[in-house]
């Protein structure tokens, strides 16, 4: 981590008031911590746009495992790209519905493509990809 540099920011008073409320709601002790997080989030979002850059994330899927061969099809897709799946968790929500959570890491485009393949598989009730950074370029 580099040295800390102090700099000034000019804001409209109403915008600052709203920012202070946000800081309080999210339990930031200082405005500086909140601003650092905003900058980091912007940098991470920029990473996601780079299709070749390595990213990490989770993919959650909810599906009825009684649907004909759905679990088998999902497993086959996962085996096709096992190198970007770090781990998976399978939870039985009730007699019919399962929650599957995949932890992913790999080139951005490959991660997004896998997520789309799984989410769009017939029988998947809901799917959500949540992306983050590998942290390598953040301080």
Curated annotation (Swiss-Prot):
Record keywords, A-Z: DNA-binding, Metal-binding, Nickel, Transcription, Transcription regulation
Binding site for Ni(2+): 79, 90, 92, 98
Domain of life: Bacteria
One biological process term in Gene Ontology: response to nickel cation
Cofactor: Ni(2+)
Cofactor binding remark: Binds 1 nickel ion per subunit.
HAMAP family referenced in this protein's UniProt entry, alphabetically: NikR
Protein name: Putative nickel-responsive regulator
């Amino acid at each position: 981590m580099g040295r800390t540099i102090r700099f000034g920011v000019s804001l409209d008073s109403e915008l600052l008031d709203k920012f202070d409320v946000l800081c309080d709601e999210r339990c930031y002790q200082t405005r500086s911590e909140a601003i650092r997080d905003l900058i980091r989030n912007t940098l991470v979002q920029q990473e996601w746009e780079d299709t070749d850059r390595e990213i990490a994330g989770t993919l959650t899927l909810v599906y009825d495992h009684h649907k004909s061969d759905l679990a088998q099809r999902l497993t086959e897709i996962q085996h096709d790209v096992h190198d970007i799946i770090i781990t998976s968790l399978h939870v039985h929500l009730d007699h019919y519905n399962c929650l599957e959570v995949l932890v992913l890491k790999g080139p951005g485009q490959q991660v997004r493509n896998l997520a789309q393949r799984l989410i769009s598989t017939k029988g998947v009730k809901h799917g959500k990809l949540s992306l983050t950074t590998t942290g390598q370029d953040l301080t």
